[in-house]
Design a protein with these regions (language model features):
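Class II aminoacyl-tRNA synthetase catalytic cores and aaRS-like
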Residues: 1-165
Length: 165
C-alpha cells in the first residue's frame, strides 16, 4: 500500500493493523449475537438501577465503535448496530491487562462484547464488559473528506456518518 497520500490517522491505524496481524489476528467470525441492541434497550431500558443489579442480566452484542471516552482505569465506548446504540463500560478490574487493547480501538472498528447490564451514575443503560473481541479493524477515518458534493452525491458513505433515525 502506498502510504505517501495517507493522513497521520490512517497511518496510525495501519500500524495498529500490522501489529494485530503480527500477533495472529485473523478476523474471527465465531461470534453469535443473541439480540439486537434495540431489543436490549426496549426490554431493559425501563428497569431501575436496583432492578438491573438484582436481575444480573447477561448481554452479548456486536457493533461499530462510534464513540470512545478514556478515563484512566476505565473506558466507555458506544457501539452501534443496525438497530441502535448502547454504551459499553470497560474497567481495569474486569479486564486487567486487556484494557490496553481497548485503548487501541478506533472509531469504526467492529467489536463484540459480553457482559452484564447495569445503569451508570448518569442513569444510562450500559453493558459492563467482562469479555470482548475485535472482529474488524477500521483503517479509514469516519470523518474522511469525501470530495466535492457533486462527485460524492451518489457514493455510499459509512453508516456512522449518517446514523439512521
Amino acid at each position: 500500500m502506498d502510504t505517501k497520500d495517507l493522513s497521520k490517522v490512517q497511518k496510525d491505524r495501519n500500524v495498529k493493523l500490522e501489529k494485530l496481524r503480527s500477533e495472529g489476528f485473523d478476523y474471527p467470525n465465531d461470534f453469535e449475537k443473541k439480540y439486537d441492541i434495540s431489543y436490549l434497550v426496549e426490554k431493559f431500558g425501563n428497569f431501575s438501577k436496583s432492578e438491573l443489579e438484582n436481575k444480573n442480566q447477561m448481554a452479548s452484542n456486536a457493533g461499530r465503535v462510534v464513540l470512545k471516552r478514556e478515563m484512566g482505569k476505565v473506558v466507555f465506548i458506544t457501539i452501534e448496530d443496525f438497530s441502535g446504540r448502547i454504551q459499553a463500560y470497560f474497567s481495569k478490574n474486569n479486564l486487567e491487562e486487556r484494557l490496553e487493547e481497548v485503548k487501541d480501538l478506533d472509531l469504526g472498528d467492529i467489536v463484540c462484547i459480553e457482559g452484564i447490564l447495569f445503569r451508570t451514575k448518569t442513569d444510562e443503560l450500559t453493558i459492563e464488559v467482562k469479555d470482548f473481541k475485535l472482529l474488524t479493524k477500521s483503517t479509514t477515518c469516519p470523518w474522511v473528506y469525501l470530495g466535492p458534493i457533486k462527485e460524492t452525491k451518489r457514493q455510499i458513505t459509512p453508516l456512522n456518518l449518517y446514523p439512521s433515525q
